[in-house]
Amino acid sequence: MKIAVVGIGVAGGYLLSRLKNEHEVIGYERMKEENHDSICAWGTSANEMRELCKKSEINFDDFIIHHGKDMHIDMNNNERFDIKLKGLVTFDKIGLIKKMAEGVKIHYGVTPKLEELEKEFDMIIDCTGFYRSYLPKIEKDFFLPTYQYKIQYDGKIPIDDFFVKPFSKMTGY
C-alpha cells in the first residue's frame, strides 16, 4: 500500500517508523528541513515511550535528556508546592523524530493539496495536530494555552526540574 503521512512530529514520525517496513511510505512536512521543530510536550512518560519505541526497534533511553525528580508548582495565590515524579523525562524530540523517519523520503517545506495526494496514495494520514490540515475541525474543541521555554545557559543548570505556573483563573499554564 502507498501511504502519505502529513505532519512529521512525534505522531507522524512514529507512524513512519511502524509502516516503513511493510508499505511504501512518504512523509510531508510544512516546515523546511533546516527549520523543522516540534513544539510542545518535551516532557513525557519514560515507561510508555520505551514501550512504543521498542515496537520500532528504537531505544528511547538514547534520547532522554533529563529524568524529573520534582515538579514545582507556583500557584497564582502565592501557594507553592512540589510533586514527586516517577518516570517523567524530557527528551531530544527532534532527534527521536529523525530516528523514527530514517530511510523514509520526506518532502519538507510543502503542504500538498488533498486532491493531489488522493491521486497518488492509497491512504493519507493527517498527523498535523490541532491544525487538522485535512480533517474537519472539531466542534467545541478545547485548547489549553501554554508557554514553554528552552533555557540557554552557561555553566551550572539554573533550574534542574519541571516548573509549572498556571495562568490566573486556571485558563492555561
Name every feature range the model reports, one short phrase each.
Residues 6-8, 14-39:
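Glycine-rich FAD pyrophosphate-binding loop
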Residues 9-14, 43-45, 131:
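Gly/Ser/Thr-rich beta-alpha loop segments that engage phosphate groups in nucleotides
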Residues 19-20, 40-43, 138-141:
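Short, glycine/charged-enriched secondary-structure capping and boundary segments
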Residues 44-98:
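A conserved beta-strand/loop capping segment in the N-terminal third of enzymes
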Residues 1-4:
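Extreme N-terminal starter segment of soluble prokaryotic enzymes
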